[in-house]
């Protein structure tokens, strides 16, 4: 079992441990953790996020939408990661923010693996932004669950 070999003090090592053989297992574990934490981060972003933070989230979402018309794969991955990390920052919870930082490279590996030649789940990302901007924590929580539970491709 690869998980017993991972040093808990340096979770960034996960990307080093990730091999072609265990990639899907690592990602499955990562997605379980995301489904536990990310909807709560969205709820908090909606309820405690500042107007300035919400405006920045809207700017990131606008860039994601623009990439639908003029897709650039590397830029999509950067903006999608920034979008998710910004929501964690908006939660104002240092543990949630630390999660996003700790797993930055795992997020990058995951987003790189699922991104091909088009934007991904734009409408589901927009539903989260709409709920956060409207300060509707419950809707943000549910919209995030919908995003994380829908198929990647």
What do these predicted ranges mean?
Residues 1-8:
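Short, small-residue-biased leader/transition segments that mark boundaries at the very start
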Residues 9-13, 18-23, 33-49, 62-65, ...:
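Hydrophobic, amphipathic alpha-helical faces that serve as interaction scaffolds
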Residues 58-61, 65, 70, 78-79, ...:
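C-terminal all-alpha effector/ligand-binding and dimerization domain
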